[in-house]
């Protein structure tokens, strides 16, 4: 057909109306790939040879460059390989693995199994087949097990597979007694073994296992690792070891007695141990701080919204046990734990008067005492522990000239309490006043999520307090405007759940306290407004709350490794939870 014939046809077809037919054959891409693969197998039009091990693979540069940035850069840049007709991988990649990658490039399909997943992930990352790397990571996530999680931790760390790393890490923490016996544990790099043994979420109730694991890791390559002994000893909660074991086994260990710094660390732990046994003042040293599995969970509640009792939550027996009456029943207070003590701040009493009182419950001696009152009476506020001190954030106070029950606008004021001197001081105020916000501490900072603003709206902001700079910033916004939510911390992740809307009441998110990024996690088992949450070990626990006229009757547990919520036990119908805290528990020894 000549050009003139086509032009004549165009002029005849110009009737002024638009008549278009878009033809699309959905199977076209697959048929092209199939034919390209056939051409490859017949070595037709191939223009490059890939060598791996003792095998050679003829390929088309254009196909490789289209599915791999590695090959695109190699063939289009000024590298020597851009002119060469051969690329030699030698033994850096197994020929069977390269064959699988090439089959995927020419077919968009690959079979991933337990035998090839790790090698495919490594090769996919090396040659920048990102889809393959991600698919292998997803496969390995679904096949995580206590026997392989250490290997997956190392693999995901080397290849920046974030989700696989996080899940592997959580499984390592949850299965410490299994992984410590694994050969992979002894081969962990120094920074990773320190991070693991020092973690608050490491699940062990016997610090002897942590100590023995540290010594075993050092002894595995004593010549190179002996210098790390002081750092590893500091990961062990030495003052929580049985006294006889600490003084006869640890203090007499030859590796320790021969190293001055290590000897000093153990001597300090012995001093802390004696203070604990003799009840001689507050012990705040890290060596005496229980991990979260060594924490006790306490629930505060009553038969009405007026809270009058403190309960112990027995996680093993799945029971809620009454422990003590609260000296001054109240509602809309905040509760926070520091060490072995529970601090109850503010709230409203039976006469609806707003309180600045602070009551302290010592869980070891099972007795109440009164601390110095806050500077501002408040209710509907949040509280959190940071560096062994207590912070109260926002809330309401009684409005001047109004009935005691009439609230002021949401407060900006933030107070700091030092239990060693029993004194309150004001610190930098919030950027925006809030009440009913979720307040927690993570990575040496305070965070306030959402809440009711000064204008009585739901605030969609994350406010963050830096103690060193004594100032608040707004580093992020919430996925939705929030109030009446609960928050708890696992590592650098802050989990937020519940709320006062149909959607937020059943939703849960996690917030990275370092990158300020949000991720949606599995929904809670029931809609919850004004629920309460704590972390214990490597899990989250949520209790209380209501939605409409429906009260939530279960204590639920979230496993971040599985992204699953389960109901642990039923809360007595006569008990309305008002607060939920996690304290240290020093086991007698």
Swiss-Prot record:
The keyword Nucleus applies. Kelch repeats lie at residues 296-340, 341-388, 389-444, 446-492, 494-538, 539-585. Residues 46-114 form the BTB domain. It is found in: Nucleus matrix; Cytoplasm; Cytoplasm, Cytoskeleton. Keywords: Actin-binding, Cytoplasm, Cytoskeleton, Developmental protein, Kelch repeat, Nucleus, Repeat, Ubl conjugation. Ubiquitinated by E3 ubiquitin ligase complex formed by CUL3 and RBX1 and probably targeted for proteasome-independent degradation. Quinone-induced oxidative stress increases its ubiquitination. Detected in fetal brain tissue, moderate expression in fetal heart, lung and kidney. Highly expressed in adult brain, particularly high in the hippocampus and amygdala, and spinal cord. Detectable in adult pancreas. May be down-regulated in neuroblastoma tumors. The keyword GTP-binding does not apply. InterPro entries: BACK (IPR011705), BTB-kelch_protein (IPR017096), BTB/POZ_dom (IPR000210), ENC1_BACK (IPR047097), ENC1_BTB_POZ_dom (IPR030562), Kelch-typ_b-propeller (IPR015915), Kelch_1 (IPR006652), SKP1/BTB/POZ_sf (IPR011333). Coiled coil: none annotated. Induction: By p53/TP53. One of its GO terms (molecular function) is actin binding. Binds to RB1. Hypophosphorylated RB1 associates with ENC1 during neuronal differentiation, while hyperphosphorylated RB1 associates with ENC1 in undifferentiating cells. Part of a complex that contains CUL3, RBX1 and ENC1. Interacts indirectly with KEAP1. This is Ectoderm-neural cortex protein 1. It comes from Homo sapiens (Human). The gene is ENC1.
């Amino acid at each position: 057909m000549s050009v003139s014939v086509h032009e004549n046809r165009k002029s005849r077809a110009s009737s002024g109306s638009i008549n278009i037919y878009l033809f699309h054959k959905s199977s076209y891409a697959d048929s092209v790939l199939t034919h390209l693969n056939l051409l490859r197998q017949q070595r037709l039009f191939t223009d490059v040879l890939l060598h791996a091990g003792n095998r050679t693979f003829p390929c088309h540069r254009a196909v490789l460059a289209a599915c791999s940035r590695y090959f695109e850069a190699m063939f289009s840049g000024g590298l020597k390989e851009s002119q060469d007709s051969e690329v030699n991988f030698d033994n850096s990649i197994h020929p069977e693995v390269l064959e699988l990658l090439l089959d995927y490039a020419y077919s968009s399909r690959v079979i991933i199994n337990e035998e090839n997943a790790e090698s495919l992930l490594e090769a996919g990352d090396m040659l920048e087949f990102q889809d393959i790397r991600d698919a292998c990571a997803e496969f390995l996530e679904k096949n995580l097990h206590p026997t392989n999680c250490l290997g997956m931790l190392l693999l995901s760390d080397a290849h920046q597979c974030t989700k696989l790393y996080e899940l592997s890490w959580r499984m390592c923490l949850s299965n410490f007694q299994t992984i410590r016996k694994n050969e992979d544990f002894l081969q962990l790099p120094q920074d990773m073994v320190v991070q693991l043994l020092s973690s608050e979420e490491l699940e062990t109730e016997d610090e002897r296992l942590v100590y023995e694991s540290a010594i075993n890791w050092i002894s595995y390559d004593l010549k190179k690792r002996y210098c790390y002994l002081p750092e590893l000893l500091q990961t062990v909660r030495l003052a929580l070891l049985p006294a006889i074991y600490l003084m006869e086994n640890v203090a007499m260990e030859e590796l320790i007695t021969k190293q001055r710094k290590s000897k000093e660390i153990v001597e300090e732990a012995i001093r802390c141990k004696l203070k604990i046994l003799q009840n001689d003042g507050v012990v705040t040293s890290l060596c005496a701080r229980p991990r979260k599995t060594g924490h006790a969970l306490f629930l505060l509640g009553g038969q009405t919204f007026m809270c009058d009792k403190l309960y112990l939550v027995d996680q093993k027996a799945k029971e809620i046990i009454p422990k003590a009456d609260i000296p001054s029943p109240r509602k809309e207070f905040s509760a926070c734990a520091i060490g072995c003590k529970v601090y109850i701040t503010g709230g409203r009493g039976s006469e609806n008067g707003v309180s600045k009182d602070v009551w302290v419950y010592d869980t070891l001696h099972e007795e109440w005492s009164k601390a110095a009152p806050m500077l501002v009476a408040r209710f509907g506020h949040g509280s959190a522990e940071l560096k062994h001190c207590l912070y109260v954030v926002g809330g309401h106070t009684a409005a001047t000239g109004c009935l005691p029950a009439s609230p002021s606008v949401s407060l900006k004021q933030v107070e700091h309490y030092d239990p060693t001197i029993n004194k309150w001081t004001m610190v930098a105020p919030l950027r925006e006043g809030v009440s009913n916000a979720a307040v927690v501490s993570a990575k040496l900072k305070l965070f306030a999520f959402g809440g009711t603003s000064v204008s009585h709206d739901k605030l969609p902001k994350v406010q963050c307090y830096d103690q060193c700079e004594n100032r608040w910033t707004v580093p992020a916004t919430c996925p939705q405007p929030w109030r009446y939510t609960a928050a708890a911390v696992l590592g650098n992740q802050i989990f937020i759940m519940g709320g006062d809307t149909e959607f937020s009441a059943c939703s849960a998110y996690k917030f990275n306290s370092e990158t300020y990024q949000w991720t949606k996690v599995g929904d809670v088992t029931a809609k919850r407004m004004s629920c309460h949450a704590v972390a214990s070990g490597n899990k989250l626990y949520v209790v209380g709350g209501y939605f409409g006229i429906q009260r939530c009757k279960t204590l639920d547990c979230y496993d971040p490794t599985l992204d699953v919520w389960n109901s642990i036990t039923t809360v007595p119908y006569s008990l309305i939870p008002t607060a939920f805290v996690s304290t240290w528990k020093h086991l007698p020894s």
